[in-house]
Amino acid sequence: GGFVHRYLLFNKDAPIVKAVAANPAFVTLPDKNILYPFGLKGVESSDKNIKHWVDKNMAILLGEDDLGPRTKPLSNGQMARAQGLNCLERGKLLYNKTRTKAEELGFDFNWELITVPDVGHDNYKLAPFASIYLFGDVEEK
């Protein structure tokens, strides 16, 4: 999830129709007062980056039981913990802060927040929900 949302932030011409950022361990917020990779301070970015970012069709996909602490230094450091105690909180923060920033700037916001009950930090169990977002429900076809 971390790679996907950052890739779209910094690659305005990314050949993406839809994307899924699942259970990011920490997030890059659209805030120039927070040091990168937790915010945009110290990197070249502008409101145009944010416009292209929020214009992409992207789902923030989160397991509702992804409540455990992260163990790697970058995702368990002070800056990451300031974003929330776990991936569920951090993913919701990314969605909400980015939606608010888009509204402040008058940009369309084409993201979706999808939470999945009874799933933790488990890509295998989240994959069917990502597939439905990306390709539609197979049973509908």
Where are the predicted features?
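Surface-exposed acidic, glycine-flexible loop patches that form ligand/cofactor-binding
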Residues: 10-13, 47-52, 103-105, 140-141
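A surface/extracellular/periplasmic glyco- and lipid-processing/surface-interacting theme
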Residues: 1-7, 17-19
